[in-house]
Every structure is written in C-alpha cells, then in structure tokens.
Amino acid sequence: MEEPTSSTNENKMKSPCESNKRKVDKKKKNLHRASAPEQSLKETEKAKYPTLVFYCRKNKKRNSNQLENNQPTESSTDPIKEKGDLDISAGSPQDGGQN
C-alpha cells in the first residue's frame, strides 16, 4: 500500500462546524465594531477640560499691537514688495528707464 504524501497530510479538510463558527465570530466582531463609535461619542461629550485651538501662520511675524488692533504695520518686511517699490521709484525696465 502507498503511504500518504506530505501534501495530503498538510491539506486537511475542515469540518462545516468550524467554518460556521468562524462566520459567527466575524459577525460578532463586525457588530462590536459598529457599536464601538457610539460608546466613544458618549465618552467625548463628558470632557473634563475645554479644548483650545491656536492658529499660526508660517513665516508671518506679528507684534502684540497687531494682535490687539488686527491692523497690519506700515513698514513691510516683504522683499518682493520692497523690490517693486525700488523699481517704481527708479523707473521700470519696461518704460525704458526714462523719467
């Protein structure tokens, strides 16, 4: 008689009971996942401390006066604006540099 090969030993058939049990387990997990967000919403409503949010702009400098008055200062630190101001006062190359 022939002995069973290693491939037939490894591939055993699973009983229908095991596959049904897995389906039930998956349904329970899905049900638990669906009910989890409701519980977390209830917990977040009872926050102990208020949440503070700060908004900061990158590469923007503001003085304390600007925060109170919410007005920009007269002196500009923008290099593009300063270059444009110099071009206007000296005459732009498009005009031929003549005043």
Swiss-Prot record:
Disulfide bond positions: none
Xref: InterPro entries: SPAN-X_fam
Region (Disordered): 1-99
One Pfam entry name: SPAN-X
Positions with biased composition (Polar residues): 1-10, 64-78
Biased composition (Basic residues): 23-32
Superkingdom assignment: Eukaryota
Transmembrane segments: none
Biased composition regions of type Basic and acidic residues, renumbered to the chain: 11-22
Family: Belongs to the SPAN-X family.
Name of the protein in question: Sperm protein associated with the nucleus on the X chromosome N4
Source species: Homo sapiens (Human)
Gene name of this polypeptide: SPANXN4
